[in-house]
Amino acid sequence: MINDILHEADGKMDKSVEATREEFAAIRAGRAQPSMFNKITVDYYGTPTPLQQLASFTSPEARIIIISPYDIGAMGNIERAIRDSDLGVNPSNDGKTLRCVFPELTEERRKEYIKVAKAKAEDGRVAVRNLRRTAKQHLEKLEKDGEVGKDDVTGAEKRLDGMTKKHTDAIDDLLKHKESELLEV
């Protein structure tokens, strides 16, 4: 029982760390990356579809991404979705591909992105702490129902605290890495 609760909490905490990593991937650093387009959905014949399913991406230079749609008919919708996103780029359409040129990051913009990264890291830490609280409530319920003893619950809570620290430290490490990436000129 206790191991099941701890195992489930650990798995969910891993997912929270991974979700934070994906959020950080969408934050633009100095180099343009296809992962920046992960959150963009395109209206494809009436169905919201992730952009990765509709096109391939290449990056010939550090600040340029070329998007080649599999279906040329979706070009206008892809262009509109990119323009409406928060990426801050205006794609140029040559009929077969979309070319997105990202401007150099200013110091002010870098600091803005660092604030966004810190907010996303805090969201990740809050998610991990909420998972800890839920798991702790389950453990206390087991003790209250008389299914396990107080010593078992105390030991499990210590293990749970260790898992929580491990996952929040992982999020902090991701944040430090993203900050250094953003400050790199």
Segments predicted by a language model, with ranges:
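Glycine-rich active-site/cofactor-binding loop and its immediate structural neighborhood
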Residues: A62-S92, K96-L98
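A positional/architectural concept
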Residues: M1-G76
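Short, conserved catalytic or interaction motifs in soluble domains
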Residues: A29, L87, K144
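Positively charged, low-complexity, intrinsically disordered RNA-binding extensions
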Residues: L98-V185
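Short, intrinsically disordered, mixed-charge
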Residues: E22, R80-G88, A119-E122, R133
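Short, electropositive, low-hydrophobicity segments enriched in small/polar residues
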Residues: P34, P50, S92, R99, ...
